[in-house]
């Protein structure tokens, strides 16, 4: 069974969101998603300064099995990306909720967080 931290919010497309304060949120893919994808070989991250809408594809995770679009779980401006993934994409596998995060976003509408799933609802969605 995948690890689903209770303090995070989740998109049905397998991204997680963690508040860092001041309207900034860290985003990554869930342990379940990285298990399905397998070993990461490349991660294409969005450009810092790019404005994205909730549900917009903004990154790509390429594994030995497939390439998968990563969607912005909330709208806002990309304020930072995880540069470590350029040389070490496997961090997405080894630490999906920590050093394997993808990017940080400054939310333009924090009300969108209410549309995301809590840990219980996300776990139920992947158990179906």
UniProtKB/Swiss-Prot annotation:
SUPFAM superfamilies: Single hybrid motif (SSF51230)
Free-text remark on how the cofactor is bound: Binds 1 lipoyl cofactor covalently.
Residue ranges occupied by any Lipoyl-binding domain in the UniProt entry: 24-106
Example of a GO biological process term: glycine decarboxylation via glycine cleavage system
N6-lipoyllysine sites (modified residues): 65
Keyword terms of this UniProt record: Lipoyl
GO CC term (a single one): glycine cleavage complex
Gene3D superfamilies: 2.40.50.100
Primary role: The glycine cleavage system catalyzes the degradation of glycine. The H protein shuttles the methylamine group of glycine from the P protein to the T protein.
Subunit structure: The glycine cleavage system is composed of four proteins: P, T, L and H.
Protein name: Glycine cleavage system H protein
């Amino acid at each position: 069974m995948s690890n689903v931290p209770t303090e995070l919010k989740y998109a049905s497309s397998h991204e997680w969101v963690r508040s860092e304060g001041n309207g900034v949120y860290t985003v990554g893919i869930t342990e379940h998603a990285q298990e399905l994808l397998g070993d990461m070989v490349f991660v294409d991250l969005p450009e810092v300064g790019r404005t994205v809408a909730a549900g917009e594809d903004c990154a790509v995770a390429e594994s030995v099995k497939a390439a998968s679009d990563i969607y912005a779980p909330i709208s806002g401006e990309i304020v930072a990306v995880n540069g470590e993934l350029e040389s070490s994409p496997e961090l997405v596998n080894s630490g999906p909720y920590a050093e394997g995060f993808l990017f940080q976003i400054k939310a333009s509408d924090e009300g969108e967080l209410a549309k995301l799933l809590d840990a219980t609802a996300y776990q139920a969605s992947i158990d179906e």
